[in-house]
Amino acid sequence: MAFDISVNASKTINALVYFSTQQNKLVIRNEVNDTHYTVEFDRDKVVDTFISYNRHNDTIEIRGVLPEETNIGCAVNTPVSMTYLYNKYSFKLILAEYIRHRNTISGNIYSALMTLDDLAIKQYGDIDLLFNEKLKVDSDSGLFDFVNFVKDMICCDSRIVVALSSLVSKHWELTNKKYRCMALANIYLIVFQYLSYLDYDTIYVSIYAGTLRA
């Protein structure tokens, strides 16, 4: 079941992708216009999704393939108690690897790196400074304080987050990970008690989006 979504980079859509060890399923949760969508499928199914930023029409593009047998649920205005979180150390290594080799990379990944150059790296001048001072890591949980990093950006441009998402998605593709997930989301504020069920190899980030067009 292939899908292609284009969103206007102006409003907010919250999304979360995580693996539930309790249910033994990969779960995608989205919130659009106060409506919550949940997609669940078995762990032995391949999910191939990629996020990129289209500079020409200022849109965020999400493309991918879901298994044919996919459970989709919908609930309106469901109250949820939530907290911020982000991923652990591998993300820093992935990003550093691509930045160091950006002169030999082309296509969407090249565009993502150029976006990072424009919106983040040039702000600090030194990528090590960016990592050490801005990507704070909680030593107990191993989670990045990524939300504060985004808020600290001078321009707070959603494109940097989309660029980071693209890099991580592409890394999973190149390393032939079977359970590839979307590297999405204004860190979909996950319910705190579910933290123990999360697979910390899942990536959470923050984007801005608006009207969905399937």
Swiss-Prot record:
The keyword Phosphoprotein does not apply. BCL2-like protein which disrupts the host immune response by inhibiting the TLR4 signaling pathway leading to NF-kappa-B activation. Acts close to the plasma membrane and targets several host TIR-domain containing adapter proteins including MYD88, TIRAP, TRIF and TICAM2. In turn, blocks the host NF-kappa-B and TRIF-mediated IRF3 activation. It comes from the Viruses. Induction: Expressed in the early phase of the viral replicative cycle. Coiled coil: none annotated. This is Protein OPG176. Keywords: Early protein, Host-virus interaction, Inhibition of host innate immune response by virus, Inhibition of host IRF3 by virus, Inhibition of host NF-kappa-B by virus, Inhibition of host RLR pathway by virus, Viral immunoevasion. GO terms for biological process: symbiont-mediated suppression of host cytoplasmic pattern recognition receptor signaling pathway via inhibition of IRF3 activity; symbiont-mediated suppression of host NF-kappaB cascade. Belongs to the orthopoxvirus OPG176 family. It holds the Pfam family Poxv_Bcl-2-like. InterPro entries: Poxvirus_Bcl-2-like (IPR022819), Poxvirus_sf (IPR043018). The lineage of its organism: Viruses, Varidnaviria, Bamfordvirae, Nucleocytoviricota, Pokkesviricetes. The keyword Metal-binding does not apply. Tetramer. Interacts with host MYD88, TRF4, TICAM2 and MAL.
